[in-house]
Amino acid sequence: MTELTFFPTDWRSEDVEPDKGEPYFRINIFGKTMDGKTVCVRAKFTPFFLLETPESWSAARTNLFITETAMKYDAIRPSCLPTKRKNMWGYDGGKMRPMVQFVFKTLSQMRKAKYRLKNEYQIYESSVDPIIRIFHLRNINPADWMHVSKAFPVETRISNSDIEVETSFQHLGPSDLKEVPPLIIASWDIETYSKDRKFPLAENPADYCIQIATTFQKYGEPEPYRRVVVCYKQTASVEGVEIISCAEEADVMNTWMTILQDEITDVSIGYNLWQYDLRYIHGRSMMCVDDITGEDNVRLKNLGRLLVGGGEVIERDLSSNAFGQNKFFLLDMPGVMQIDLLQWFRKNRNLESYSLNNVSKLYLGDQKNDLPAMQIFEKFEGGADDRAIIAAYARKDTDLPLKLLKKMAILEDITEMANAVKVPVDYINFRGQQVRAFSCLVGKARQMNYAIPDDKMWTVDGKYEGATVLDAKKGAYFTSIAALDFASLYPSIIRAHNMSPETLVMDKRFENLPGIEYYEIETGLGTFKYPQKNDETGEGQGVVPALLDDLAKFRKQAKKHMAEAKKNDDEFREALYDAQQRSYKIVMNSVYGFLGASRGFIPCVPIAASVTATGRKMIEHTAKRVTELLPGSEVIYGDTDSVMIRMKLPDDKIHDMDEQFKMAKWLAGEITKDFKAPNDLEFEKIYYPYILYSKKRYAAIKFEDPDEKGKVDVKGLALVRRDFSPITREILKESLDTILFKKDTPTAVTETVECIRKVLDNEYPMEKFTMSKTLKTGYKNECQPHLHVSNKIFERTGFPVPSGARVPFVYIEDKKNLDTKQSFRAEDPTFAQENDLIVDRLFYIEHQLMKPICSLFEPLLDDPETEIFGHPLIKGKIDELKSTFKADLRDAKRTKKNIANNQREITSFFKKK
């Protein structure tokens, strides 16, 4: 027997059926010790659920039921015990209910029993993942140091780890160790070849995987310690890089896997691994088969820490409104944490392009070496020096992800989110918000002696209103506007009014209990009541409010630690605590959505309706109190959690920014007194000037300090929307800067007219007109510009655009397709420039510039379209374009009709001189 402290990198679970003995359930935990030894801990666990029994049953009747049920469904009888828990569904005064905890040897046995018993009895918590269960039972963080108090040697090993032990889940616990874990990060990238000069396809015999580059860096260290490129065919040396040349393609992949094992890799990262590199390696491994024996020459099973089972194919589907349906293709690496930085950026950043080159340029000021695919193919066919150029290119593609990982604190972001919600890291990559919130709820419910019932759902009859938006008083305000915001409004409402599934009154017997104060709120779904907690003792607090209290406390602590780390110039810990506090904030804000979902683990739509109804009342009350506390003031707009106020101040204080800040803070403090804690109305900024277009659409200069210069703040306008071209955003930005900073509308009009004139005269480069959209799968409407362009790219190059990629396109003048839909006139910008194609100026004027520009100037001009687009400098040019378009369209239709009728045009009889 021994003790063990290690940092976990991967959690796995499985039912085990040994050759001898009973089947059992096991959790395999992989990780690394402080001295760099790899670990595999095999922890036995007995899955369980709770079952509610009738209150009328005697102890003898209950015991008989336990015995009979345990025998019938293969439960572990000595471990199946009666207990009492509170039901987390519907207020009943916190009554303890009789339950039985049924414990099973395997997860499959537990599930079979649950499905057979659920129609007769109320089952609780059968859907809790056993790994998540252990996190809460043993107070373990999924990605933090942990301790095994009793570990035993194994008879038969399942891993190649330095240390492999068996234990019971009861011997697992957290560790006090706070050191940076000695994790080895491997950033890797493959280079591929196509003999036919098309997009390389793994199933084509001659489309080899020609190089695999890997850069290794120890977590927390400033620089990599090893760079290696494994190459197919002899390759010359590259400075600072270890070159390994192989005679066979299979040797390239096998050597690479051996290097990963030798370096004891804990974290595997790259860019677009899950949609390209891993799929390609798997495809090529299937091609590398011994001609005589038929055996695989590539040993994918060597991936990861298990002796058997590495390299298995894992396909994941991820569906979202933003990206459509995406398929991810992984090769299993047991014990190794896998991160695809491309997917992290798609999920967390809103960018024009997600290419490694663009992302690196944006966040690092660095970029890839320029080596197009065709040159890679040519250099592979050349000599050793040519292939060395490919190796240098590949090495750079492994350095950039490591720099991005550190710069953006991506590993910290993922692991701290996993720790905050107590789910495996893998869930952060591939699961949504529901399972995160549910895990938090499971832990808090257990602490408070509640059980979460299975299959509970509120039948929605009617529709509740969303967040309040007070009528926007549109206009250009060249006076100061104070913005008052509620801090974390929805979580604060839930905490203040004790809203939780088990505090919601669903039974009239409990709606007027003596000595209990209730909060009552009317919604579109009906009127709901919630018993309030005792403010002095905390008695009666609901599970969800208690959970949110904890998360708020944890976030406050993390922000404090972050400030201390910043003070001590500890960048690593500052990033760590920043990731922590952001994780807690995200979880707090996701609880409302979790409860308001129509389907899920414990959907409770009345709570969501109650929260939004309460928020509406608070916004309306705030607007009323502003005019009472500061007569003559006006609320010009109210959104979900904020109000915009034109404060009435003495004439000599109107332009005094210090006085504006002082009065706004006083207003916020006075109104906060009207609301139940922890609701807090804060003052954070003054807008001056402020142009209000409609709800959720404004432009202003924001001041967060009376002595600062101020920053432009825009919401809802074309200026900040990706579906408009850069030229649109550029013109709008220039116009808006003049309006806001110079407060000079006439000059802004003049500058805008000149910009439009330059568009009409083709004075802007093509990239200013280039837009992009994410390519999805399964379009119902195939008349999409980016879809047409992606098809054109494939037809011309043989290189398919992968699903999930952003496809750039530009609309060009195309007389042949004037009578077709506009999307057919979309073109690949690179092709358009190489072939001297002209931008469709009329399209950009009418569909990209006219409406956004007129909308921008609407509060400032009587007739923006006439004053700008009717200006003598540009009106004639626009009219000429329209006239030419009509004539060309008429000719195109006539030509198409003649072709359809097999008729020659009269001009075909004339000879050109």
Curated annotation (Swiss-Prot):
Catalytic reaction equation(s): DNA(n) + a 2'-deoxyribonucleoside 5'-triphosphate = DNA(n+1) + diphosphate
Keyword Hydrolase found: yes
Chain segments annotated as transmembrane: none
Gene Ontology biological process terms from the UniProt entry: base-excision repair, gap-filling; DNA replication proofreading; nucleotide-excision repair, DNA gap filling; viral DNA genome replication
Keywords (A to Z) from UniProt: DNA replication, DNA-binding, DNA-directed DNA polymerase, Early protein, Exonuclease, Hydrolase, Multifunctional enzyme, Nuclease, Nucleotidyltransferase, Transferase, Viral DNA replication
NCBIfam families in the cross-refs: pol2
Family: Belongs to the DNA polymerase type-B family.
Entry protein name: DNA polymerase
